[in-house]
Amino acid sequence: MNSTEEIDLYNRWKALERQLEMLDLQEGFIKEDCKSLKRELIRAQEEVKRIQSVPLVIGQFLEAIDQNTAIVGSTTGSNYVVRILSTLDRELLKPSASVALQRHSNALVDILPPEADSSISMLRPDERPDVSYADVGGLDVQKQEVREAVELPLTQGDLYRQIGIDPPRGVLLYGPPGTGKTMLVKAVANSTAANFIRVVGSEFVQKYLGEGPRMVRDVFRMARENAPAIIFIDEIDAIATKRFDAQTGADREVQRILIELLTQMDGFDQGANVKVIMATNRADTLDPALLRPGRLDRKIEFPSYRDRRQRRLVFQTITAKMLLSPEVDLDTFIMRPDASSGAQIAAIMQDAGLLAVRKSRGVILQSDIEEAYARAVKPTDMEQFAFYK
């Protein structure tokens, strides 16, 4: 190797050495930058946690203005233009979504899951009523109609498609108090594998504007997400009376709830496996738009007056687990037309059992039932039932 080649190799070695020193220096700078960025990341995460720390204000996302600002509604009824936390996923910000607002600046700092502020819940399998169809005395026609309208479409929907007809979308149970409407629905909940959602009409009437319609949307959304499902709305007349020219804000809000209910019943398709059952004591006060075919296709009446056969079945069902004296003649009470409703007959036998307990007897005597009958059945009872006709 000549001297020229040695000089070239030496120069190349020196250049690589300088380059290595430069890389070592850059590595040190990068490590320092990484440490600084990690400290900034930790500070930013702590700041986000501080901003998202409870208590927060619950609001409703209304509309996005741009990527950084949006319009939200608060529980007080006011609307605000607020900033959106940069770490939030904009794809999850849908209209009517529940959001959390920072309590001082009202900045949108979190997106709540749909169920977070919903007061609607489904009955778990272990929470289902232990009432079966056998526990409902009489009402053979009503049982058959409910099964055809609710159970059969959920369990054997192919039969309806084979024939070429749509199954009933909703069912209305109407009749005086104590005639077995709610008890029959409990039997439906117990006998089907479908998810069961129960609400009372008055629960939709909330303090703040817009809360009632939002709850209606939550009920139907939950039912669609957990299909097959049954929605039972008891005392539907609380929100579905005939519309009129409302003069107060409360009346207008109730009418908005009804409109949302009508919209939701029109909105879900027949294949969603969602059935709606409504119950009321005053079917004559309901809005005609709710009663039209396509919403409540089946209307099942629960009569206040029961014939002897129906009363016999009710007495037999109620007394099946009771210890009656051999002298008890139930036909004596079955022949009397006064005790008409199942709840009234159940109250008579319950009171008779309490009389036997009071006298420290292990069996119920005829005299106990007679005394309980005299207490429970008043001459004005039949006149009270006339109010619901």
UniProtKB/Swiss-Prot annotation:
Keywords: ATP-binding, Cytoplasm, Nucleotide-binding, Nucleus, Proteasome. It is found in: Cytoplasm; Nucleus. ATP binds at G175, P176, P177, G178, T179, G180, K181, T182. GO terms for biological process: proteasome-mediated ubiquitin-dependent protein catabolic process. Gene3D superfamilies: 1.10.8.60, Nucleic acid-binding proteins (2.40.50.140), P-loop containing nucleotide triphosphate hydrolases (3.40.50.300). GO terms for molecular function: ATP binding; ATP hydrolysis activity; proteasome-activating activity. Belongs to the AAA ATPase family. This is 26S proteasome regulatory subunit 6B homolog.
